[in-house]
């Protein structure tokens, strides 16, 4: 129909703008020109065509893809100098912050870069300050808006009866379990393999054998479990199966202690491997923070009764942060190894 045609054209233009602005943020230096052609391929790899169709193309793209695009365009504008660019960022950041997950993503990301500039340059980056304020307003708005409470009430009855009776700690614990189940046990996201393989290859090239061992161990654990072999995640799956047999409002920390611990160890190992990989520790810290921001944005779904109904689309911020870190690792390769290889 004509409506779908207009929507498809709009989505195509939005994605083109996304790639242009993404490359403008992370690959602005001409020595990274080759990576600019890789970005679209990586995007299609980690966001396959069916990813944004789980709740219908228009609904899913409107709720997740367009806020992602708006956030990147707004971020690109903040990276530019001049009042005109700052003003231009407003509508895009406001649109992005109307989606709760990207509000959190923007708030933590811009706050970090604001602090980073302060510690490194001893001056305030007013663009990031404005971005932080806008994201903070968006976060507060999402928390106090009357419509949020009503929607939460309706969704509780529909998707998770008894959700309102769970404590905050239990909600977060359930979100933690579900997030890591998808990452490590069922391994449904391509980004986890791409990230681990990227870390492993670069660490071997740089002869950082500890990082190689750490990333290789996690990759082996995830792959072996995916292929049906016995691993430390086998027992995790059994605990999950047991938990699924319990009433949906019941959660025992004692019964789930093993998977909680294993997930924490896997996350810690990945964090250490990334930190070791970068020679510039500010870059290492930035990569870890960006990955943590995506994880936190996904974890925010813990506070929603649709936690088990919303599907993989709620992992969009986490996948996006993984893409950023992968690109940062590729940049590290060019900075430290690529020049020597091609001389």
Regions found by a protein language model. Name each.
Residues 1-5, 101-104, 118, 123-274, ...:
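Transmembrane catalytic cores of multi-pass membrane glycosyltransferases
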Residues 77-94, 126-130:
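Short hydrophobic alpha-helices at membrane interfaces in multi-pass membrane enzymes
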Residues 9-34, 73:
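Transmembrane-helix motifs of polytopic, lipid-linked glycan transferases
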Residues 214-216, 267-268, 275-291, 295, ...:
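Signature aromatic-anchored transmembrane alpha helix within multi-pass, membrane-resident enzymes
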Residues 35-78, 252-272, 297-326:
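Membrane-interface micro-motifs in multi-pass membrane enzymes
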Residues 72, 85-109:
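Membrane-interface alpha helices of multi-pass inner-membrane proteins
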Residues 21, 73-80, 109-117, 195-202, ...:
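Transmembrane alpha-helices and membrane-interface helical segments
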Residues 30-35, 81-87, 124-125, 208-209:
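Membrane-helix interface segments
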């Amino acid at each position: 129909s004509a409506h779908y045609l207009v929507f498809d054209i709009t989505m195509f233009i939005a994605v083109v703008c996304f790639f242009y602005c993404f490359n403008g943020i992370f690959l602005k230096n001409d020595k990274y020109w080759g990576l600019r052609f890789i970005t679209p391929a990586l995007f299609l790899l980690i966001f396959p065509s069916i990813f944004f169709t789980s709740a219908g193309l228009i609904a899913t793209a409107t709720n997740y893809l367009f806020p992602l695009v708006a956030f990147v365009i707004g971020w690109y504008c903040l990276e530019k100098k001049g009042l005109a660019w700052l003003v231009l960022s407003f509508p895009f950041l406001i649109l992005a912050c109307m989606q709760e997950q990207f509000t959190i993503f923007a708030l933590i990301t811009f706050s970090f870069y604001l602090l980073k500039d302060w510690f490194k340059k001893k001056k305030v980056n007013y663009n990031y300050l404005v971005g932080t304020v806008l994201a903070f307003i968006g976060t507060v708005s999402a928390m106090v808006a009357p419509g949020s409470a009503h929607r939460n009430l309706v969704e509780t009855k529909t998707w998770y009866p008894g959700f309102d009776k769970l404590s905050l700690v239990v909600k977060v614990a359930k979100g933690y379990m579900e997030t890591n189940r998808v990452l490590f046990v069922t391994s449904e996201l391509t980004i986890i393999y791409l990230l681990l393989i990227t870390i492993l290859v670069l660490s071997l090239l740089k002869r950082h054998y500890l990082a190689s061992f750490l990333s290789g161990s996690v990759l082996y654990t995830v792959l072996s479990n995916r292929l049906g072999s016995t691993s430390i995640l086998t027992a995790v799956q059994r605990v999950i199966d047991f938990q699924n047999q319990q009433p949906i409002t019941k959660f025992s920390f004692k019964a789930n202690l093993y998977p909680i611990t294993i997930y924490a160890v896997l996350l810690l190992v990945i964090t250490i491997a990334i930190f070791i990989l970068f020679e510039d520790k500010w870059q290492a810290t930035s990569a870890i923070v960006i990955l943590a921001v995506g994880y936190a944005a996904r974890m925010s779904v813990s506070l929603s009764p649709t936690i088990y109904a919303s599907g993989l689309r709620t992992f969009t911020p986490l996948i996006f942060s993984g893409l950023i870190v992968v690109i940062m690792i590729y940049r590290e390769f060019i900075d430290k190894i690529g020049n020597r290889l091609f001389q």
